[in-house]
Swiss-Prot record:
This is Large ribosomal subunit protein bL27. GO terms for biological process: translation. GO terms for cellular component: cytosolic large ribosomal subunit. Residues 1-20 are annotated as: Disordered. InterPro entries: Ribosomal_bL27, Ribosomal_bL27_CS. Belongs to the bacterial ribosomal protein bL27 family. One of its GO terms (molecular function) is structural constituent of ribosome. The gene is rpmA. Coiled coil: none annotated. Residues 1-10 have a biased composition (Gly residues). Gene3D superfamilies: 2.40.50.100. HAMAP family: Ribosomal_bL27. Keywords: Ribonucleoprotein, Ribosomal protein.
Amino acid sequence: MAQKKGGGSTRNGRDSESKRLGVKVYGGQEILAGSIIVRQRGTRFHPGVNVGVGKDHTLFALADGKVKFGTKGALNKATVWVEAAN
């Protein structure tokens, strides 16, 4: 007779790596052109002046300056823009 029970198997034990999404530079902070402002899935934040959009919806600065967050349009969409440094 067996001295130990047979080892069971499980279908658990996997998880995906976190994608480190979110705001990387907050309102009022200085930023350099090309720096990432927000990493996101979909356009939770929309691009404003001096802000570009990557193919994965990442928002990045097109000019050096100060990051600003706010809303725009009739639908009050969350928007990010960069006030260019003079």
